[in-house]
């Protein structure tokens, strides 16, 4: 209709109630009883009156849907009067540069901005009522901000619904000056032909996204939700957010579209549940955090605190009580771990304690109770041990004098935990802090004898239960030897026992490792185990048994020598593929006194009768059988490196038999 008309002026008039038949070009939807023209004495001119329901009573321009207006000016002005307590709405059909037609629904019924790719709902609750108003709508701003990427091209349709009084409709090329406008931006005035009389109270109100946001901030009770309004409101502290927040973008017609989606009950419920889940997860994360966690400890400040386990974790994160640790004064010597005094005798319980006692006798205890599947509590224990490692700035050297029996060297010993059904009790582990491997066995033997009675009882109850790490230590101190047996036995070579221990102790704590080490940086290549065959393991087992028997005969106070302890020091493979493979932790020393490969050499020549008597039963007359049986019962046979050697009692019996 206006496409071929000149629109380069200040305004273009679309509708006026003056004249003989002002609604001739308009499509009127409603009976004459609700839509009519009358003379208004207040404004001293004719006006169009629309009453009744805004859904049914309205006027539309152009009449035919195939026609278009083709209005290209930026601002659309409705000169209207809206009564109190009545709804009013208008609908605008716009076309963007992509020739896509979109609709803007402006109504007092809407309480928030919502949009789809082709439609948008804009609230009009801020409109001035019971006064004549020049309602100026910024078409360019609404198009570009609501429909992302769209650029306004033309206004092609207008629908005005009840309830209102309508005097004029026109477009403006420039922004009009508002009644309460204090901006310094350039603004135009309403054209003289479109102005109301000076004695008629009226206001000019500009409507765009910025005004909608400002109105929301002012009133607070009417939320506006769009991409810009969310950013605008979040930048101001005084704004009030509603729980029904809209998404910045949504899916429409199979593609992702920027802008808020239309409100719906199902979408709000889903969004509310998502926010609830996020808030619950945030509270749980806060409850599981440790408030006094310190990862960097100054070497000068030796009065650092152990990490206290948070009470919130005991209340929310775990069902077991948590006992916080106490700070260590700076005057105390370097603390070392010490076993708790009361190991639990309950096999089904998985409560574990970590005791800390320095050489002066002061004791600090940190307990944490958790189930075997509670990985978070295990991480807390590992973190406490990590900080304990950081506190020990200097390791104990070999030159340190041997402590008296009254105060044995401190070691990690864990009380009983849930074991296999065969009745295995809790496991214990000892970490000797002496650098000399030769004195390690002496220290362990003496301290095991002079330790507390409760500890001795716990050791006797479980002579075969061994504490094994489920993962290889990442920061193993150099020069330290591990005594895996409570009775001083340096190694375990029974594959069956290995599998039993591995299955039973998988619920124990993970390896305590830390980011810092008291010595030089750990090189894993130095501790890479070498593969050993089954025959070599059997040879080591026979060597250990032979050495134990020899030392029992000679009255030695301990097991093997230090070099043999290092050679027999084995660890269980932690690979998930093979849990029964034994690996040697350290290579065999060069200066070892006795080596199993040397023992495999053929023995020195001996009496062939001794070998015949041992490999096959001798032919003995029946009269001498009782004597031979009594003598054979007192003989002992030992195996060393696959070769069979005869002891002195058996040689004597063979001599008598011959």
From Swiss-Prot:
Residues 351-363, 417-434 have a biased composition (Low complexity). It holds the Pfam family CFA20_dom. Residues 339-349, 494-506 have a biased composition (Basic and acidic residues). It comes from the Eukaryota. InterPro entries: CFA20/CFAP20DC (IPR040441), CFA20_dom (IPR007714). Residues 319-328, 625-634 have a biased composition (Polar residues). Disulfide bonds: none annotated. Residues 507-521 have a biased composition (Acidic residues). Residues 312-522, 589-634 are annotated as: Disordered. PANTHER family: ORF PROTEIN. This is Protein CFAP20DC. It comes from Rattus norvegicus (Rat).
């Amino acid at each position: 209709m206006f496409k071929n008309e000149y629109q380069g002026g200040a305004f273009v008039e679309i509708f006026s109630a003056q004249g003989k038949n002002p609604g001739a070009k308009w499509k009127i939807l409603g009976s004459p009883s609700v839509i009519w023209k009358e003379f208004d004495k207040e404004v001293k001119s004719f006006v169009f009156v629309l009453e009744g329901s805004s859904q049914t009573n309205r006027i539309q321009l152009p009449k035919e849907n195939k026609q278009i207006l083709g209005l290209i000016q930026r601002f659309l002005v409705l000169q209207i009067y809206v009564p109190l307590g009545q709804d009013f709405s208008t609908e605008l059909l716009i076309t963007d540069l992509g020739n896509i037609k979109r609709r803007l629904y402006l109504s007092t019924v809407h309480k928030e901005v919502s949009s789809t790719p082709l439609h948008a709902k804009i609230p009009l609750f801020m409109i001035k009522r019971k006064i004549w108003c020049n309602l100026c709508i910024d078409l360019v701003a609404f198009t570009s901000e609501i429909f992302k990427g769209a650029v306004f091209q033309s206004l092609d349709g207008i629908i005005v619904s009840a309830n209102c009084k309508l005097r004029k409709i026109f477009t403006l090329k420039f922004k009009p000056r508002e009644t309460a406008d204090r901006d310094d931006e350039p603004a135009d005035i309403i054209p003289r032909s479109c102005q109301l009389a000076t004695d008629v109270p009226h206001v000019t109100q500009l409507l765009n996204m910025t005004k909608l946001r400002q109105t929301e901030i002012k009133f607070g009770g009417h939320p506006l939700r769009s991409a810009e309004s969310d950013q605008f409101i979040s930048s101001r502290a005084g704004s009030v957010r509603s729980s029904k927040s809209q998404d910045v973008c949504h899916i429409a017609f199979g593609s992702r579209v920027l802008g808020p989606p239309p409100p719906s009950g199902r979408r709000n419920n889903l969004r509310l549940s998502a926010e609830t889940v996020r808030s619950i997860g945030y509270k749980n994360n806060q409850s599981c955090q440790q408030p006094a966690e310190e990862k960097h400890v100054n070497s000068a400040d030796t009065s650092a605190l152990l990490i206290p386990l948070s009470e919130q974790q005991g209340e929310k994160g775990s069902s077991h009580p948590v006992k916080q640790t106490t700070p260590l004064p700076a005057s105390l010597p370097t603390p070392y771990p010490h076993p708790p005094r009361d190991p639990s005798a309950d096999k089904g319980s998985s409560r574990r304690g970590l005791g800390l006692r320095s050489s002066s006798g002061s004791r600090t205890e940190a307990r944490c109770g958790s189930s075997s599947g509670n990985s978070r509590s295990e991480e807390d224990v590992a973190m406490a041990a990590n900080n304990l490692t950081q506190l020990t700035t200097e390791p104990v050297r070999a030159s340190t004098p041997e402590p008296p029996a009254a105060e044995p060297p401190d070691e990690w010993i864990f009380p009983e935990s849930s074991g296999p059904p065969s009745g295995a009790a809790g496991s214990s582990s000892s970490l000797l802090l002496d650098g000399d491997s030769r004195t390690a066995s002496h220290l362990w033997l003496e301290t095991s004898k002079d330790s507390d009675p409760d500890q001795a009882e716990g050791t006797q109850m479980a002579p075969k239960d061994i504490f094994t790490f489920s993962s290889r230590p990442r920061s193993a101190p150099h020069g330290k030897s591990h005594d895996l047996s409570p009775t001083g036995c340096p190694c375990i070579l029974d594959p069956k026992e290995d599998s039993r221990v591995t299955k039973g102790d998988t619920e124990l704590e993970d390896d305590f490792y830390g980011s810092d080490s008291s010595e030089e940086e750990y090189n894993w290549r130095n501790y890479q185990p070498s593969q050993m065959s089954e025959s070599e393991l059997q040879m080591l087992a026979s060597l250990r048994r032979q050495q134990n028997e020899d030392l029992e005969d000679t009255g030695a106070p301990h097991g093997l020598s230090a070099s043999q302890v290092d050679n027999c020091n084995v660890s269980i493979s932690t690979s998930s593929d093979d849990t029964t493979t034994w690996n040697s932790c350290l290579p065999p020393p060069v200066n070892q006194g006795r080596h199993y490969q040397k023992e495999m050499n053929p023995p020195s020549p001996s009496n062939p009768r001794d070998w015949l008597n041992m490999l096959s039963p001798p032919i003995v007359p029946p009269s001498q059988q009782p004597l031979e049986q009594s003598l054979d019962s007192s003989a002992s046979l030992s195996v060393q490196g696959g070769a069979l050697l005869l002891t002195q009692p058996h040689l004597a019996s063979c001599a008598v038999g011959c």
